[in-house]
C-alpha cells in the first residue's frame, strides 16, 4: 500500500539513507531512535522503510520516551539515531552530541539535520547557528567520521550529515578544547581543515550515492540504484516544492 507523508525538514538525509541503505535496513540497521520526534511523521517514514523506531519527545503524547534526551538513562543502544532540527535548540551542543554518540551502536549511523539561517537572524528557540563551518567542526570534535560519511549541504534549506563513529576517536578527547585542529580531526573531516570561507547556500553532497547537485530548478537530482525495490513511500516537502517516491 502506498503511503504519503509531508515533511518540512529532514527530507534530504531521509531520502539518501533509505534509498542507499535499503538492502541493509532490517539486517544491519534494525532499531532507530527519533530524537525530538514531534508529531512522529519522520518516525512513520522510517517505520515504513522497515526500521523499529522509538520516539523521544517530552512534549509528545505518542512518544515511547516522553522525557528529556539528556537526562534519560537508556538501557540499550540504537542502530540509527535520527535527529531533525533539534540540535539548534540545545544549550550545550557538545554534550548533546556526546549523548548521541553514547546511545548509538558501535557500527550505527547518525542522521542529523539543522537549519542554515544566518547568525544575524534571531529565531525563537534557536540558540545556535549551523552553517557548515560550525556544523562540521561540532561533529568532528564529537567523534563522528565525516570523511567516510556523508555530508549534505542542501541549498538554503538545511545542512545534514549521515555519519558513523570515527575509528580514531577516543573518549579522552572530550576533555580537550577546540583550540586547534589535530591530526585526528583532519582524518575525520570531509574537507581540509584550514582557515577558509565555505559557501553555505550551494547544493553539495559529499559521498552521497542517491542525491546529486544539478542545474535544474530544484538544484538536485535523485539517482536510484539499478536493483532498488521501492518502499512505496511518497514524501513531499510542500514548503520547498519537493516530491519523491522511494
Regions found by a protein language model. Name each.
Residues 90-91, 104-106:
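Helix-to-beta-strand junctions that scaffold the AdoMet/dcAdoMet cofactor pocket
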Residues 122-127:
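Short, solvent-exposed loop/turn segments at secondary-structure boundaries
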Residues 115-120, 152-153:
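Short "lid" loop at the C-terminus of a central beta-strand within the Rossmann-like core
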Residues 91-94, 115:
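Active-site segment flanking the S-adenosylmethionine/decSAM binding pocket
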Residues 107-115:
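Conserved beta-strand signature within the Rossmann-like core of class I S-adenosyl-L-methionine
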Residues 84-89:
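Short catalytic micro-motifs in class I SAM-dependent methyltransferases
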Amino acid at each position: 500500500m502506498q503511503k504519503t507523508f509531508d515533511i518540512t525538514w529532514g527530507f534530504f538525509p531521509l531520502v539518501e539513507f533509505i534509498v542507499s541503505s535499503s538492502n541493509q535496513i532490517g539486517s544491519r540497521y534494525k532499531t532507530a531512535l527519533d530524537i525530538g520526534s514531534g508529531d512522529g511523521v519522520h518516525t512513520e517514514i522510517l517505520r515504513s522503510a522497515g526500521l523499529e523506531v522509538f520516539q523521544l519527545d517530552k512534549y509528545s503524547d505518542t512518544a515511547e520516551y516522553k522525557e528529556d534526551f539528556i537526562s534519560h538513562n537508556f538501557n540499550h543502544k540504537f542502530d540509527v539515531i535520527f535527529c531533525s532540527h533539534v540540535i539548534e535548540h540545545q544549550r550545550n551542543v557538545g554534550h548533546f552530541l556526546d549523548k548521541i554518540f553514547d546511545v548509538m551502536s558501535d557500527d550505527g549511523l547518525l542522521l542529523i539535520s539543522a537549519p542554515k539561517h544566518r547568525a544575524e537572524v534571531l529565531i525563537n528557540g534557536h540558540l545556535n547557528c549551523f552553517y557548515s563551518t560550525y556544523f562540521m567542526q561540532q561533529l568532528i570534535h564529537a567523534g563522528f567520521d565525516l570523511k567516510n560519511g556523508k555530508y549534505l549541504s542542501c541549498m538554503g534549506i538545511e545542512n545534514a550529515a549521515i555519519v558513523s563513529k570515527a575509528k580514531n576517536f577516543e573518549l579522552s578527547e572530550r576533555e580537550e578544547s577546540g583550540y586547534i585542529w589535530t591530526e585526528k580531526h583532519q582524518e575525520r573531516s570531509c574537507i581540509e581543515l584550514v582557515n577558509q570561507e565555505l559557501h553555505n547556500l550551494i547544493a553539495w553532497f559529499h559521498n552521497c550515492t542517491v542525491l546529486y547537485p544539478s542545474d535544474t530548478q530544484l538544484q538536485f537530482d535523485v539517482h536510484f540504484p539499478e536493483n532498488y525495490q521501492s518502499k512505496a513511500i511518497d514524501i513531499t516537502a510542500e514548503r520547498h516544492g519537493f516530491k519523491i517516491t522511494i
